[in-house]
């Protein structure tokens, strides 16, 4: 299969080679890229870790990861090609001198080194120092880091300062995997390639916007991490604000990385501050109690293994967000995300204003709003709810709600939509930063989020309980109902 012209010859170095992220996401994605013919024939994959492995041992680990986490049977021909790329470097990231071993394996003259930090952010400074001291940080070397970075503006700045000491911003790729999802990428095309939306995407025509990211799972044994982060830092700061920016941004001058990111930063700077004076009015936070998920009884958050019984960490957040700019003044954005909700789904719903004059009162006293639903997962696609006349000989215009539906898998006849990590890995190899988050984006998001988390801490108001398997605390319904609106119902 032909390799695309943009595929570059790389040494992909995975720090944390035996970790969960590498095994669940990175390795299966690399297999799919191999299958699609997107990896340059001379690209290598080098795992890094403290394990006393050689190439053969690491190859066995990779094979086991693919067998465990891929839904398809491994093609032996593809496996032979992929496994030939593999190598392993035994390295403790806190041992700066040991990075010379990695340097001896790399081919900086003929290959671009991509350092993927599949490890906790607390290790990033040590890794960058090791790479820098071993002179492995010169352009065009790149580093890839997973968000969220830190737990506040201050800790995020500390991490970015450590990275910035050895790598320039043009070398840094901060991953938010939601930006690699096909339907999120489609937002740019949907908004800016169709005059229907280009000319009807502001406070003159849109009433409000809802963004929901619902998780069916609990904390999945990650108590130590999650209790320090909570749903606000883990999901709102990390994913939902990026989706909000893609919905709310003004048209960029072009599709270059900085043009797109400049517009997203403008949105983040326009977010109305939420602090102690309005935090109870604008936010709801909850914590799941025992209930049922996927037909099984599940424990509450405070009953999870390793739990601190007095924890006030939120597992659910709902927020009314106001954007103070000319495009969105008066249009609320409602965000909600939580764990142990009834289903796993992510969607954006844009509600359009109803006509000022209703000509069809005989059929419908109060016309329902047209709404555009962008399904991020599952069943990726877009649908528009409109009113149509019911066929018949009746002289009245009997109206009925119908949907114009674009399902990705059906419309494009694709059984496999590329996983977000497939695209993002490929973009790092191409050297394209448009789908990655710039430092000022991260810091503007943290400024806004910190104001809320600080207000919660000062307010000393415990999260509202909600039973596992339900749509969060009743207070989240009350928040949106006060504005005369309601959350979208999932079918």
From Swiss-Prot:
According to the UniProt entry, the coiled-coil residues are: none
Binding-site residues, NADP(+): 50, 92-93, 147
Q: Does the keyword Signal apply?
A: no
EC number(s) recorded for this UniProt protein: 1.1.1.49
Gene3D superfamilies in the cross-refs: Dihydrodipicolinate Reductase, domain 2, NAD(P)-binding Rossmann-like Domain
User: Which Pfam families does its entry note?
Assistant: G6PD_C, G6PD_N
Q: In which pathway does it act?
A: Carbohydrate degradation; pentose phosphate pathway; D-ribulose 5-phosphate from D-glucose 6-phosphate (oxidative stage): step 1/3
Work out whether the entry's keyword set contains Ligase: no
Q: Which residues bind substrate?
A: 177, 181, 215, 234, 339, 344
Tell me which InterPro entries the record gives: G6P_DH, G6P_DH_AS, G6P_DH_C, G6P_DH_NAD-bd, NAD(P)-bd_dom_sf
Recorded GO CC terms: cytosol
Q: Name one GO molecular function term.
A: NADP binding
> Which residue positions are annotated as catalytic?
239 (proton acceptor)
List this protein's GO terms for biological process: glucose metabolic process; pentose-phosphate shunt, oxidative branch
The reaction(s) annotated as catalysed by this protein in its Swiss-Prot or TrEMBL entry are: D-glucose 6-phosphate + NADP(+) = 6-phospho-D-glucono-1,5-lactone + NADPH + H(+)
UniProt keyword terms in alphabetical order: Carbohydrate metabolism, Glucose metabolism, NADP, Oxidoreductase
- Family that this chain belongs to: Belongs to the glucose-6-phosphate dehydrogenase family.
Annotated PANTHER family: GLUCOSE-6-PHOSPHATE 1-DEHYDROGENASE (PTHR23429:SF0), GLUCOSE-6-PHOSPHATE 1-DEHYDROGENASE G6PD (PTHR23429)
Q: Its function?
A: Catalyzes the oxidation of glucose 6-phosphate to 6-phosphogluconolactone.
Spell out the protein name for this chain: Glucose-6-phosphate 1-dehydrogenase
């Amino acid at each position: 299969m032909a390799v695309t012209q943009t595929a570059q010859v790389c040494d992909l170095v995975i720090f944390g080679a035996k970790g969960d992220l590498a095994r669940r996401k990175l390795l299966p994605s690399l297999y799919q890229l191999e299958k699609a013919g997107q990896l340059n024939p001379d690209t290598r994959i080098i795992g890094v870790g403290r394990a006393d492995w050689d190439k053969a041992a690491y190859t066995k680990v990779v094979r086991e990861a693919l067998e465990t986490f891929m839904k398809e049977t491994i093609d032996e021909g593809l496996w032979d090609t992929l496994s030939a790329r593999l190598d392993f470097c035994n390295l403790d990231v806190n041992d700066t001198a040991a990075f010379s071993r990695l340097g001896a394996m790399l081919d900086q003259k003929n290959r671009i080194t991509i350092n993927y930090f599949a490890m906790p952010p607390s290790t990033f400074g040590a890794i960058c120092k090791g790479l820098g001291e071993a002179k492995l940080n010169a352009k065009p070397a790149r580093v890839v880091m997973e968000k969220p970075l830190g737990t506040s503006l201050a800790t995020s700045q500390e991490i970015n300062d450590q990275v910035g000491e050895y790598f320039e911003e043009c070398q840094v790729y901060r991953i938010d995997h939601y930006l690699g999802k096909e339907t999120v990428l489609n937002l740019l095309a949907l908004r800016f390639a169709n005059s229907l939306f280009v000319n009807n995407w502001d406070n003159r025509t849109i009433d409000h916007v809802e963004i929901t990211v619902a998780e069916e799972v609990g904390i999945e044994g990650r108590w130590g991490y999650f209790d320090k982060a909570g749903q606000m830092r883990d999901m709102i700061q990390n994913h939902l604000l990026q989706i909000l920016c893609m919905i709310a941004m003004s048209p960029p001058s072009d599709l270059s990385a900085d043009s797109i990111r400049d517009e997203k930063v403008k949105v983040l700077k326009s977010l109305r501050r939420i602090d102690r004076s309005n935090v109870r009015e604008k936010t709801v936070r909850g914590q799941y109690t025992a209930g049922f998920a996927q037909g099984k009884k599940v424990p509450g958050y405070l009953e999870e293994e390793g739990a601190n019984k007095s924890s006030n960490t939120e597992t659910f957040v709902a927020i009314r967000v106001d954007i103070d700019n000319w495009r969105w003044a008066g249009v609320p954005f409602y965000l909600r995300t939580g764990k142990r909700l009834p289903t796993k789904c992510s969607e954006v719903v844009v509600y359009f204003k109803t006509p000022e004059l209703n000509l069809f009162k005989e059929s419908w006293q109060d016309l329902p709003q047209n709404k555009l639903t962008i399904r991020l997962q599952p069943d990726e696609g877009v649908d528009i709810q409109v009113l149509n006349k019911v066929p018949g000989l009746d002289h009245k215009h009997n109206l009925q709600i119908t949907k114009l539906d674009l399902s990705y898998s059906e419309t494009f006849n694709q059984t496999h939509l590329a996983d977000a990590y497939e695209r993002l890995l490929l973009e790092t190899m191409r050297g394209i930063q448009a789908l990655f988050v710039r430092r000022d984006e991260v810091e503007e998001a943290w400024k806004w989020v910190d104001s809320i988390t600080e207000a919660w801490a000062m307010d000393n108001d415990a999260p509202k309980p909600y039973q596992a398997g339900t749509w969060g605390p009743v207070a989240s319904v009350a928040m949106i109902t006060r504005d005369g609106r309601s959350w979208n119902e999932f079918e």
